[in-house]
Regions:
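Positively charged n-region of N-terminal signal peptides that target proteins for export
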Residues: 1-8
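Residues in well-ordered beta-strands of folded domains
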Residues: 14, 86, 161, 220, ...
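C-terminal segment of classical bacterial N-terminal signal peptides
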Residues: 14-23
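Residues in and immediately flanking transmembrane alpha helices
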Residues: 15-16, 79, 307
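Active-site-adjacent loops and short helices of periplasmic peptidoglycan-processing enzymes
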Residues: 23-175, 179-188
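Domain-terminus/edge residues, biased toward the C-terminal soluble/receptor-binding domains
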Residues: 155-156, 168-312
Length: 312
């Protein structure tokens, strides 16, 4: 008789978690006490929610807003990423003295280069310039499309008010960011760009030489990532750049893969004080993400379900 092969995977706990009581089976506190105000971790192979901490809590989106701008771009222009636009002067005042990739007004960029700038450097001018150009200057119309797509993806606690995240009206939740990231991961270009430790921006009209954009997701960089580096890290973005002289909360949305198992990590509003790696640039949400990556891959494993035709 032909053996029946099961088509689903089951999530099983390894020996390291067997000592925990059933009620704490998916609680990382025995390994690490999560300090973020909300968090959501999901295994994308099984859709099992591995960890949920107040995941519907509404929080400031900040730079994570760019994920929605990129989602809208890829939805409409995924096959046109090498098309070009000119960085408009009109957005200069709005993004002045904020996170950027030194993309100057009247310089010409491809859509792809703008995505690199957004994903690697959280560049506000890349998001606003692209949105302004593609909308014909109708930024309100672009934002309306962002909200429509967000709802189509399935978000229920998110509101978008600009293309880059500088406006405080941009709000989201951990579970919504999971849905948005999962949608983005369906685009090969997004996956490829997110995983790049660095990108060389070609020379432009006001840049006589090419220049390098280093990915702020230092967990991708074995050379310079230090204690943050994780081989399993595939890509991610924070709501703000690393802290140095100021203090505050930070959020990080990312995904990791090890031995064929993929997890999405949405860690929202980690306090500055939780980063104990000791570097001058503090990355509290990335710190908590790396600790939770360690917990997940040390505690869980994906195994084939039992063959129902095999005798025990």
């Amino acid at each position: 008789m032909k053996r029946i092969v099961t088509l689903f995977l089951s999530l099983i706990l390894l020996l390291s978690c067997l000592c925990a009581p059933a009620s704490a089976m998916f609680d990382p506190s025995l390994f690490y006490e999560v300090q973020a105000k909300s968090a959501y971790i999901v295994n994308t192979d099984t859709n099992i929610i591995v960890y949920d901490k107040d995941s519907s809590r509404q929080v400031p989106a900040g730079g994570l807003t760019k994920y929605m701008t990129i989602a809208l771009l890829l939805t409409n222009y995924a096959d046109q990423l090498d098309n070009t636009f000119q960085m408009p002067f009109a957005i200069s005042d709005y993004v002045h003295n904020s996170d950027n990739a030194d993309m100057r007004s009247n310089e010409t960029f491809t859509y792809r280069e703008a995505v690199y700038a957004m994903l690697l450097r959280n560049a506000n001018e890349a998001a606003m310039g692209l949105a302004y150009s593609l909308s014909g200057g109708d930024l309100a119309g672009w934002v309306s499309q962002m909200n429509t797509l967000s709802q189509r993806i399935g978000t229920t606690g998110s509101t978008w008010t600009d293309a880059c995240g500088l406006d405080s009206g941009n709000v989201t939740t951990a579970v919504d960011m999971y849905l948005i990231l999962r949608y983005l991961m369906s685009f090969d270009a997004f996956v490829d760009i997110s995983s790049a430790p660095a990108f060389t921006m070609p020379a432009k009209e006001k840049h006589t030489k090419s220049f390098v954009l280093l990915n702020q997701n230092v967990a991708l960089n074995k050379t310079s990532g230090g204690s943050f580096y994780r081989k399993s890290m595939q890509g991610g973005m924070c709501d703000v750049m690393a802290y140095k002289n100021d203090h505050g909360d930070q959020s990080y949305v990312s995904w990791a893969n090890q031995d064929g198992s993929t997890y999405i990590f949405c860690i929202m509003q980690s306090p500055d004080t939780c980063d104990t790696y000791g570097y001058a640039n503090r990355r509290p949400a990335l710190y908590e993400t790396t600790r939770l990556i360690d917990w997940v891959f040390q505690s869980f494993s994906i195994q084939p379900a039992l063959d129902t035709d095999l005798a025990l």
